């Protein structure tokens, strides 16, 4: 509640916390090998937490959970995985052969990466679990597909979107021009790592926050950003070399091995780090059952704004949110299955008036440009003038990409660029709407936090 700066929904926070033990137990049953200490789970501590309460798999928890879930899905007789599909847009009542006006979501149009053809996947219920919009920024720890696809599709279909101004920047991403997006886990600071200015040789966090390296991510990221700008640095140092070497190797085996391959021995030398975009705290408005504004459409995870995180996500709560709301959405669909109407006839994708692209340079140019100006103008520290500059560029590029989209066949790169622009627009509009600094949104023009904590809610005007 403290990290969320007053915007958390207390009921949702309690809802998630109460269901955490069951979610962890289910993951164990699916084969996630959480670290143990004796007969109990080993608990670690990360930024913003007052106690050790985080279960983990060494320093590769996300990978271990992903592998377990994928293996379980592949083995389940009622689950059919359809790989290499890139979603274009939701199929709604507007796409019915006989328009009903019900506003229902009936599935999704997706292009097959292998064939280039557009498929229509229909269903009684559709769940968006598409992740965040990290690739909107030049530097991000997010995977390549994190282009805000679910958020953009839901917005275009008619869903409200909330709190998109709250983009979390992880304080410690490895600074290496050849190896991008390698995250140095928060647990390194939790287990004693110190942030040091390489010019002065001093640990600088005491000058910024009494919680030192364990302050919330927004505080630590702004502190690092301030040191970099004040001293003209490319990076700062994260140093855990004062801890026993065996302790470091045991707690961070994957990071240790990766860094050794890059010529850095973290048991002897500091790690060069910089902040990078890490998590999208805003998204599609959902309730505790994962329901969106549209009948038949559910969402879970980073693409949503559930009320759990507020203005800043507490470390390691993202996976928990996925499990709890994924279960909640599935349970709600199962309970209501007999009441969910089957999909009516839906029109296939129409490519009759488009041609193959002969201007791929447009996509590459805009892709690079948008990520660069979002980093420079809509980053860790903002101003109204920078946000307005970003808004002007987004408007110009949106018109250009819309013209391109209307004349050429869809490709995965074009789909992602279109969604990047849409989510960038939502981020900037939300940031301009908030006339205060709160949590992850820090603006020099409004540095104080207002007394009333109010969500930013954007409502589609095209409906």
Feature-to-residue mapping (PLM):
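Glycine-rich active-site loop/strand segments that organize a redox cofactor
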Residues: 1-16
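Alpha-helix capping and helix-loop boundary segments enriched in small/acidic/polar residues
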Residues: 11, 57-60, 114, 118, ...
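Glycine- and aromatic-enriched mobile tails/lids
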Residues: 26, 32-52, 196-213, 224-227, ...
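Conserved redox-cofactor binding core of oxidoreductases
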Residues: 28-117, 122-124, 129, 173-176
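General beta-strand structural signal in soluble alpha/beta enzymes
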Residues: 34-37, 81-84, 120-122, 128-129, ...
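FAD-site-proximal beta/loop scaffold in flavoenzymes
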Residues: 89-115, 120, 264-308
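Glycine-rich loop(s) and the adjacent beta-strand/alpha-helix scaffold that form part
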Residues: 125-179, 215, 229-230, 317-328
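An anion/pyrophosphate-binding glycine-rich loop and adjacent beta-alpha core
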Residues: 153, 159-271, 332-339
């Amino acid at each position: 509640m403290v990290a969320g700066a007053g915007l958390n929904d207390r009921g949702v926070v309690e809802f998630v916390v109460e269901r955490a033990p069951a979610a962890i137990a289910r993951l164990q049953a699916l084969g996630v090998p959480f670290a143990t200490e004796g007969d109990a789970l080993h608990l670690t501590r990360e930024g913003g937490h007052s106690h050790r309460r985080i279960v983990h798999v060494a320093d590769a928890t996300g990978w271990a959970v992903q592998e377990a879930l994928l293996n379980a899905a592949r083995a389940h007789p009622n689950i059919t995985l359809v790989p290499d599909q890139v979603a274009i847009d939701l199929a709604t009542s507007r796409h019915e052969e006989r328009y009903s006006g019900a506003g229902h979501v009936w599935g999704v149009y997706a292009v097959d990466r292998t064939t280039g053809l557009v498929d229509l996947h229909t269903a009684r219920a559709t769940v968006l679990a598409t992740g965040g919009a990290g690739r909107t920024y030049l530097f991000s720890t997010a995977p390549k597909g994190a282009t805000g696809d679910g958020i953009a599709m839901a917005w275009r279909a008619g869903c409200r979107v909330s709190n998109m101004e709250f983009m979390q920047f992880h304080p410690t991403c490895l600074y290496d021009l050849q190896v991008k997006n390698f995250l140095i886990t928060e647990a390194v600071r939790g287990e004693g790592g110190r942030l040091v200015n390489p010019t002065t040789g001093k640990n600088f966090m005491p000058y910024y926050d009494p919680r030192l390296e364990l302050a919330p991510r927004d505080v630590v990221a702004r502190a690092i950003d301030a040191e970099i700008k004040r001293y003209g640095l490319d990076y700062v140092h994260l140093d855990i070399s004062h801890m026993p070497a065996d302790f470091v190797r045991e707690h961070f085996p994957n990071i240790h091995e990766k860094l050794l391959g890059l010529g850095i021995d973290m048991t002897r030398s500091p790690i060069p780090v910089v902040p990078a975009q890490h998590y999208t705290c805003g998204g599609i408005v959902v309730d505790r059952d994962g329901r969106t504004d549209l009948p038949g459409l559910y969402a879970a995870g980073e693409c949503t704004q559930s009320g759990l995180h507020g203005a800043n996500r507490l470390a390691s709560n993202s996976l928990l949110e996925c499990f709890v709301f994924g279960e909640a959405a599935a349970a709600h669909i199962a309970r209501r299955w007999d009441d969910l109407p089957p999909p009516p006839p839906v029109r296939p994708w129409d490519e009759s008036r488009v041609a193959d692209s002969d201007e791929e340079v447009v996509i590459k140019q805009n892709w690079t440009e948008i990520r660069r100006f979002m980093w420079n103008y809509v980053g860790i520290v903002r101003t109204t003038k920078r946000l307005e500059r970003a808004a002007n560029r987004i408007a110009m590029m949106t018109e250009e990409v819309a013209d391109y989209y209307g004349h050429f066949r869809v490709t995965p790169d074009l789909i992602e660029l279109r969604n990047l622009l849409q989510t960038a627009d939502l981020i900037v509009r939300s940031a301009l709407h908030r006339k205060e600094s709160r949590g992850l949104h820090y603006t020099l023009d409004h540095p104080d936090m207002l007394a009333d904590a109010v969500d930013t809610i954007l409502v589609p005007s095209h409906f």
